[in-house]
C-alpha cells in the first residue's frame, strides 16, 4: 500500500470558523471547504490562510485581502502582509511596517521597535529592548518592562526578567511574579516551576516542591501532567500528588483519559489509575486527539481508537515538522487530517477516506 505522509493537525490549537484550507493546484493557490469543494478557485501566486474572516493574497507583486467568497475587501497595495487578528493586521508598504484595520486604513499605535501581530486581543510592543502589551485600540495595556513575553496560551503568558520567569494575564497583571529559573504553562490556576534546585507546583501563588523530581512537563487538557523522579516518569495531579508513581521510561500527556507510556522498549496506553488499556506493542505512540484517535507506529504509522482498535492501518508515514505545532497533541481535529501521497496533498477523514477525492500540489491547515 502506498505510504501517505501525515502532517498532523493539532487537537485544540486551531479554529475552524471559516472551514477553508489553502490548497495549490496547477501552480496557483485557492481554498477548499470541508465538503471537499473548491470554495475559491486557485488563482493566486502566493496566499495565506484565513484569519479573522480575511486572507492575505498576492496579486502579481502586491498583497491585499479577500473574504471567504473570494471577493477583494482590501485592494492589493502592500509589499508584505501578515494575518488579521482582533480586527488589525501588520502590513508593509514602502519599507514601513504598520497596522491596518479591515477597511485597509492605517491605525495609529504607540511607537515600537518591532510590529507584532495581535493574538487573543493583545499584541506585543517593544521599546528600549523591553516588551509590553497594547490592545486593538492602540492603548498600552502593559508598559514595556519585560525582557521577553512568550505567546499567550489560554489567556496567560510566560514573562522573563533578569533570567527569572513569571506569568501574566492579558491585562498585564502578574499572576506569578518573575522569581523562578523555569516555569510552565498556567493551567486552572496552577503551574510548575523550578526554584533553586527544586521542581514543584505553584498553587495559590505559593511554591510547593515535589521531593526528588528533576523535571515536570506542561499541563495539557486534563488535571494532571507527567514528571520525572529517579530517572522514571509518573503522573501528578494539580496538587502535586502522585496519581501514578514513576515507573515508565517515557510518557506523554493524558487526553481522553489515556496516556502513551514507554516501557520494555514498546509504547502502550494507560488510564488514570496506571492500568494498561492498550498493552505496550508499538515502536512509538502519540497523544489522543479530541476526535478519539491516536497515532501509533509499528514499521509505519496508523491510528487507533480509545479501545485500542486499529481504525487506520499502520501503512503510513507521519511528520510533525512544522514549528508552529507547539503542542503535545497530534492527530485529527474536527474529523480531518492533512495528508500527502506520492507528492500530492489532501485531507483524510477519521475513516481514512480522502476529502472530496482530490489531491493537490500543496495543502495547509483548515482555519
What are these regions (language model features)?
Residues 1-19:
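Bacterial Sec-dependent N-terminal signal peptides
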